Curated annotation (Swiss-Prot):
Enzyme Commission (EC) number: 6.1.1.1
Protein name: Tyrosine--tRNA ligase
InterPro entries: aa-tRNA-synth_Ic, Rossmann-like_a/b/a_fold, S4_RNA-bd_sf, Tyr-tRNA-ligase, Tyr-tRNA-ligase_bac-type, Tyr-tRNA-ligase_bac_1
Keyword Repeat: no
Catalyzed reaction equations: tRNA(Tyr) + L-tyrosine + ATP = L-tyrosyl-tRNA(Tyr) + AMP + diphosphate + H(+)
Membership in a protein family: Belongs to the class-I aminoacyl-tRNA synthetase family. TyrS type 1 subfamily.
PANTHER family (UniProt xref): TYROSINE--TRNA LIGASE, MITOCHONDRIAL, TYROSYL-TRNA SYNTHETASE
Cross-referenced SUPFAM superfamilies: Alpha-L RNA-binding motif (SSF55174), Nucleotidylyl transferase (SSF52374)
Length: 414
């Protein structure tokens, strides 16, 4: 990104790597200089908690508030009843109103850790406020006439689904109209002039901008973040044990800490910029470390991210537990080392095959039973998928395999 921003917020977005695209960088920059801007990100309530994949955009809202602006977290109490079809191969299962409300309550706990809510602070809204009471015929006449079906079919999120000859229901097709209407209502009710989101939401964001300009002649903007993957191509938000939840009741602070401690060397500097508030220069310095020194940077990363979500005490406790496990009979010299050849990985190796071939379990059948009963952990993360692929990235400098509470092995590449 070569644009030289004048506003603090856009400077942070560019310098730390949050920015993928913006509908009008110069106009947004000028507005941010002139005074506080209100912006929102929408979250459909499809699960009981947010996960690490949502954290990038949550940090964007946090920086937005820290640079003197007003963020809105928009809960999709209305749109969740329809379901976002973007880049999905099949229709989302429909949730009951009670389940949607339950999920929203769980998500609110996460946002409260990152944003300051109040009369002059961040706002938490629910689009059911205006969507639930819509009159369908009035909506078609007043709003639907502004949308071109030809243009909607050209958006990549829809086009990719149709190109694969996968069904797209009329219910789902309406989602992008409802999301666009959210922006119009947020501008009309709260003066919101910026929508942010992942780059997969670009089409939905542009729809909202076009609608609001047509109906209210408003100058508003959209800004997207990159869809983040790890250096080895894995999608953020997942670990060997499944989703990395931002709810302590669904994933313990210790397991959350371990997720960040196990970051691949090549990702440390980038993740420090995106998920912590350390100065950029310090992030670059830590990310440039190598060998055993990079492990200290990973601990700093884990502590900083865990502190933001769960608090400093939880981060300190997680680090202390990790030291006890790894240094006093965990992943240090006291563990029996199992060496795995690179050839063993070449043809593909599942975690079941790893356990059986290295003798950690007596057979593949025993390994499957162990996983089904929740008795296997890799680097202290529970594993539930017997088909989990074991590769060089997962093994890294050493993969701690725990069977039950007392049997531990260290798998290394020979």
């Amino acid at each position: 990104m070569t644009y030289r921003a004048k506003s603090d917020f856009l400077n942070v977005m560019i310098e730390r790597g949050y920015l993928a695209d913006c509908t009008d960088m110069q106009a947004l920059d000028d507005a941010l200089i002139d005074g506080p801007v209100t912006a929102y990100i929408g979250y459909d309530a499809t699960a009981a908690s947010l996960h690490v994949g949502h954290l990038l955009n949550i940090m964007m809202l946090r920086w937005f508030q820290k640079t003197g602006n007003r963020p809105i977290t928009l809960m999709g109490g209305g749109t969740t009843k329809v379901g976002d079809p973007s880049f999905r191969s099949e229709e989302r299962p429909l949730l009951t109103p009670d389940k949607i409300d339950e999920n929203i309550a769980g998500m609110k706990q996460v946002f409260a850790r990152y944003l300051d809510y109040g009369d002059q602070g961040a706002m938490m809204l629910n689009n059911a406020e205006w969507l639930d009471s819509l009159n369908y015929l009035d909506f078609l006449r007043d709003i639907g006439r502004h949308f071109s079906v030809n243009r909607m079919l050209s958006f990549e999120s829809v086009k990719s689904r149709l190109d694969r000859e996968q069904s797209l229901s009329f219910l789902e097709f309406n989602y992008m109209i409802l999301q666009a209407y959210d922006f119009l209502e947020l501008y009309r009710r709260y003066g919101c002039r910026l929508q942010m989101g992942g780059s997969d939401q670009w089409g939905n964001i542009v729809n909202g901008i076009d609608l609001t300009r047509r109906v209210l002649d408003a100058e508003i903007w959209g800004l997207t973040s990159p869809l983040l993957t790890t250096s080895d191509g894995r999608k953020m938000g997942k670990s060997a044990g499944g989703a990395v939840w931002l709810n302590g009741a669904m994933l313990s602070p210790y397991e959350f800490w371990q997720f960040w401690r196990n970051t691949t060397d090549a990702d440390v500097g980038r993740f420090l910029k995106l998920y912590t508030e350390l100065p950029v220069e310090e992030c670059d310095r830590l990310g440039a470390l190598s060998g055993s020194e990079i492990n200290a940077a990973k601990i700093i990363l884990a502590n900083e991210v865990t502190t933001l979500l769960h608090g400093a005490d939880a981060a300190a406790s997680a680090e202390a537990t990790a030291r006890e496990v790894f240094e006093q009979g965990g992943a240090g010299g006291d563990l029996e080392v199992v060496t795995l050849s690179a050839d063993a990985l070449a043809s593909g190796l599942t975690v079941v095959q790893l356990l059986a071939q290295t003798g950690i379990t007596a057979s593949g059948k025993e390994a499957k039973r162990l996983i089904a009963e929740g008795g296997l952990r890799l680097n202290n993360e529970a594993v539930s998928d017997p088909q989990l692929a074991v590769d060089a990235a997962l093994i890294g400098d050493g993969l701690k395999v725990s069977v039950g509470k007392k049997k531990h092995r260290m798998v290394q590449l020979g």
